[in-house]
């Protein structure tokens, strides 16, 4: 299972939030 938090680390919080709105696994720990 990929580590999304590490994968999206370089991205901005806005982009992370936008990506989180798409269909990602519930395990995705996004900072909201």
Curated annotation (Swiss-Prot):
EC code: 3.4.22.-
Key word Hydrolase present: yes
Principal EC category: hydrolase
Propeptide: 1-22
Function: Thiol protease.
Family to which this protein belongs: Belongs to the peptidase C1 family.
UniProt-recorded name of the protein: Cathepsin B-like cysteine proteinase
Organism: Fasciola hepatica
Phylogenetic lineage: Eukaryota, Metazoa, Spiralia, Lophotrochozoa, Platyhelminthes
